[in-house]
Design a protein with these regions (language model features):
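Amphipathic N-proximal alpha-helical interface segments
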Residues: 4-11, 33-105, 109-179
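N-terminal targeting signals for Sec/Tat export/insertion, comprising classic cleavable signal peptides
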Residues: 15-39
């Protein structure tokens, strides 16, 4: 997937979708209702919907859409995509390639790298390696490799590459929710 044509987060496409689009342009209302996830945020202001191996996906195995609760147009405020790996080194290799492209595209944006423990793994053996770009309009883009411990892999957790686009509105929600 080429990222170099985008100047604004709404110009980025993941599986043809962009921030600000209606999810109804890509999924039926039944699909949207059937794919609602349990809220993982401190409040339910935004709804999470995960879609696995959908017929129109060309690059990613899973796409995650977040929209405001009670938004009957399902306007996408956050859009994520994931690939799953048996070998974390494959994830790191693809992450590195994406970061090289993003470094060129967002050369004037603030960039941050963070390695942190996955809160679900109480042993502290699972990590996320995240590079985040802060765009001038308040939106953000993250490229993350999640490296689950062997014990979590055996429970069905797969190492994954995640590319996440967040509107300013969604980024502000997360900043307040987790401050």
């Amino acid at each position: 997937q080429s990222w170099t044509q985008a100047d604004d987060i709404r110009d980025f496409k993941i599986e043809g979708m962009s921030i600000g689009d209606s999810a109804l342009d890509y999924f039926s209302e039944k699909e949207l209702k059937d794919n609602k996830q349990a809220t993982q945020y401190p409040n339910d202001k935004f709804i999470i919907r995960n879609f696995y191996l959908h017929s129109f996906f060309e690059t990613y195995e899973m796409v995650t859409v977040n929209h405001k609760k009670n938004d009957n147009k399902y306007i996408i405020e956050s859009l994520g995509a994931s690939l799953f790996f048996d070998d974390i080194e494959e994830c790191f290799s693809i992450q590195k390639k994406i970061i090289i492209e993003f470094d060129q595209t967002f050369e004037n944006s603030e960039k941050d790298f963070e390695r942190f423990k996955k809160s679900l793994d109480k042993t502290g053996s699972s990590y996320s390696n995240m590079t985040e770009y802060y765009l001038s309009n308040g939106s953000a883009i993250q490229v993350t490799c999640d490296d689950w411990s062997k014990a979590f892999n055996e429970q069905g957790f797969k190492d994954s590459l995640n590319v996440n686009l967040q509107s300013k509105k969604f980024k502000e929600f997360l900043d307040i929710a987790y401050d």
